[in-house]
Curated annotation (Swiss-Prot):
The gene is mnmG. Its main location: cytoplasm. The lineage of its organism: Bacteria, Bacillati, Bacillota, Clostridia, Eubacteriales. InterPro entries: FAD/NAD-bd_sf, GIDA_C_N, MnmG, MnmG-rel, MnmG-rel_CS, MnmG_C, MnmG_C_subdom, MnmG_C_subdom_sf. GO terms for biological process: tRNA methylation; tRNA wobble uridine modification. Belongs to the MnmG family. Homodimer. Heterotetramer of two MnmE and two MnmG subunits. It comes from the Bacteria. NAD-binding protein involved in the addition of a carboxymethylaminomethyl (cmnm) group at the wobble position (U34) of certain tRNAs, forming tRNA-cmnm(5)s(2)U34. Gene3D superfamilies: FAD/NAD(P)-binding domain, GidA associated domain, C-terminal subdomain, tRNA uridine 5-carboxymethylaminomethyl modification enzyme MnmG/GidA. Its cofactor is FAD. This is tRNA uridine 5-carboxymethylaminomethyl modification enzyme MnmG. NCBIfam families: mnmG_gidA. SUPFAM superfamilies: FAD/NAD(P)-binding domain. One of its GO terms (cellular component) is cytosol.
């Protein structure tokens, strides 16, 4: 029986990585927030890989942290190994990655929600969204509880009509054996929301006692641990190693012999899977010339023997999986604790959303995470944070927070989803960002903390720490520019020793650092007035000096980009009135409703000629008005 159970400013449906960030942001910005989850023990669940960060994803975590989100702080408290990836490449692609203690990560996030003043956490299944006159009114749960609200954020992950597939065994389920949400999809369809089916998968988990690590390559953590969160100066912890092994000729033979039993190839799987995270059977079919594939053996926590077999997700039948895993060097006696599986689920076409992550046709309804067609914990958390912030800003009748592509990877992520859409689970990559030298993980706080402070998520002590770091970096760069180095004998000897050329005339220390064979750290013996700075401040100064020319070029490109981004398109525009626009362009522009010319130019099917026609039309209208 339906009953009125309470009134909230914001209701968050789902407590995965998107839901947790959305609820915490909403509550910390002063809104009374209800977060509903199918199971209180699955909050911030890592249903697949036991790590946070990695290439481009580490950038997202740093940006979440800079804006006042929780993911970076949570992983800093619960990691068991930390590594900086891509250190042999330029700073634009340096990416922090940490192995998590999955259980502790989840437990700490759950405890944060329980302690947060403005959060009410409930184990409930929402089955219906109540909308009147295109505006959200409330949610109904399976228990009959009805909650009124001003905003709803859908963070349903892979639960909507979830379906587990292992060979020819198919059954209704959420991830990791949890219950699926089978009723909410129909409510969304009734509201006119377009749904689609996507697929993802996860590898088996095996018992550590059954693994022969002597046949594998050990991958320890970095000696110097770099925190994800800018609030942490240093972290120290005994780390647990990961291990690298490879598939064998026998692995490939077993898969080829049983490929007809794979749901991927016999038609059992309808959902579209992630291009950049294929199953092992998909890799072997798609890349027949490769005689082996990397397999990463990763611990799932400090107090468990479970190991994650990274790079070997599968939906093959269980009997085939056993043979397949045991054909990998070091896994000959592997005991499978959890079988690998594929999972299909309902999600939306994200082009139904605007850049705030609110549905265009339903006021107060937002989407975040895998529900929006993305993949990955970090992508989900980033969207949850932005959806939570914007839901509150709208309730408070303030301007929304819309990050541009030149502001953050989060801006690229949301713009790609909303403007371009996606036909497969979307994964963030550094190659998607046009201005990646400006969007480095090391400067995320310098780019975004001011915004986090303005919306109320970054508190005073954190903000003061940020201002101090910013001031230290600026002051040191100014000092280096003004400090002249002359060609004294001892200085030239030092330079020759470093493989550099002698000085013929005075030069600033800042210019000297730019030499390829030198950097801020190497010239310290020439700098007796160097102030005491933190490691991250030193790194920031070094990057700014070394890459100044490239950075300035990208800043010029951003200025060109902003000319289009600043040309706002009137909400009242009728594209049918614009003579010269092609039919496809009219249809796409009507569907996506871009807010500016820049966004319009990135829509697939809208040509440069269409943009020219649109600009001429807007100029004419401006003159008429």
């Amino acid at each position: 029986m339906k009953y009125l159970a309470g009134d909230f400013d914001v209701v968050v449906i789902g407590a995965g990585h998107a839901g947790c960030e959305a609820a915490l942001a909403s509550a910390r910005m002063g809104c009374k927030t209800l977060i509903c989850t199918m199971n209180l023990d699955s909050i911030a669940l890592m249903a697949c890989n036991p790590n946070i960060g990695g290439t481009a994803k580490g950038h997202l975590v740093r940006e979440i942290d800079a804006l006042g989100g929780e993911m970076g702080i949570n992983i800093d408290h619960t990691f068991i190994q930390s590594r900086m990836l891509n250190t042999s490449k330029g700073p634009a692609v340096h990416s922090l990655r940490a192995q998590a203690d999955k259980k502790r990560y989840s437990e700490r996030m759950k405890h944060l929600l329980e302690k947060e003043d403005n959060v009410v956490l409930r184990q409930l299944e929402v089955i219906e969204i109540d909308v009147e006159d295109n505006e959200v009114k409330g949610v109904l749960t399976k228990n009959g509880a009805y909650f009124t609200t001003k905003a709803i954020i859908l963070c349903t992950g892979t639960y909507l009509k979830g379906k587990i597939i292992i060979g020819d065994i198919i059954y209704s389920s959420g991830p990791s054996g949890l219950y699926p949400a089978n009723d909410l999809s129909q409510s969304l369809l009734d509201l006119g929301i377009n749904l689609r089916r996507f697929k993802t998968g996860t590898p088996a988990r095996i018992n550590k006692r059954s693994v022969d690590f002597s046949k594998m390559i050990e991958q320890p953590g970095d000696e110097k641990i770099v925190p994800f969160s800018f609030i942490h100066n240093k972290l120290d912890k005994d780390q647990i190693s990961c291990y690298l092994t490879y598939t064998s000729e026998e692995t490939h033979k077993i898969i080829h012999q049983n490929i007809h039993r794979s749901p991927l190839y016999n038609g059992s799987i309808e959902g579209v899977g992630p291009r950049y995270c294929p199953s092992i059977e998909d890799k072997i079919v798609r890349f027949p010339d490769k005689d082996k594939h990397q397999i990463f053996i990763e611990p799932e926590g400090e107090n468990t023997e479970e190991l994650y077999v990274g790079g070997m997700s599968s939906s093959l039948p269980e009997d085939v999986q056993i043979k397949m895993y045991r054909s990998v060097p070091g896994l000959e006696n592997a005991e499978i604790l959890r079988t690998a599986y594929a999972i299909e689920y309902d999600c939306i076409d994200p082009q139904q959303l605007d850049l705030t992550l609110e549905f265009k046709n339903i006021n107060g309804l937002y989407g975040a995470g895998q529900f929006n067609g993305s993949s990955g914990y970090e992508e989900a958390a980033a969207q949850g944070l932005i959806a939570g912030i914007n839901a509150v800003l709208k309730i408070k009748e303030k301007n929304p927070l819309i990050l541009k592509r030149s502001d953050a990877y989060i801006g690229v992520l949301i713009d790609d989803l909303v403007t371009k859409g996606t036909n497969e689970p979307y994964r963030m990559m550094t190659s998607r960002a046009e201005y990646r030298l400006l969007l480095r993980q090391d400067n995320a706080d310098l780019r975004l903390t001011e915004l986090g402070y303005k919306v109320g998520l970054v508190k005073e002590d954190r903000y003061n720490k940020f201002l101090n770091r910013k001031k230290n970096v600026e002051n040191e760069i100014e000092r280096l520019r003004n400090m002249q180095i002359t060609g004294k004998r001892e200085i030239n000897e030092f330079l020759l020793e470093k493989g550099s050329t002698e000085l013929k005339k005075p030069i600033s220390l800042y210019e000297l650092i730019k030499r390829p064979e030198l950097d801020y750290f190497k010239v310290e013996p020439l700098d007796d007035k160097r102030p005491s700075l933190s490691d991250d401040e030193k790194e920031e100064i070094n990057i700014i000096a070394k890459y100044e020319g490239y950075i300035n070029k990208q800043l010029e490109q951003v200025e060109q980009f902003k000319k289009y981004e600043d040309r706002l398109i009137p909400k009242s525009i009728n594209y049918l009135d614009i003579k010269g626009l092609r039919l496809e362009a009219i249809q796409k522009l009507e569907k996506i409703k871009p807010i500016n010319i820049g966004q319009a130019s990135r829509i697939s099917g809208v040509s440069p000629a269409d943009i020219s026609v649109l600009l001429i039309y807007m100029e004419r209208k401006n003159r008429e008005n």
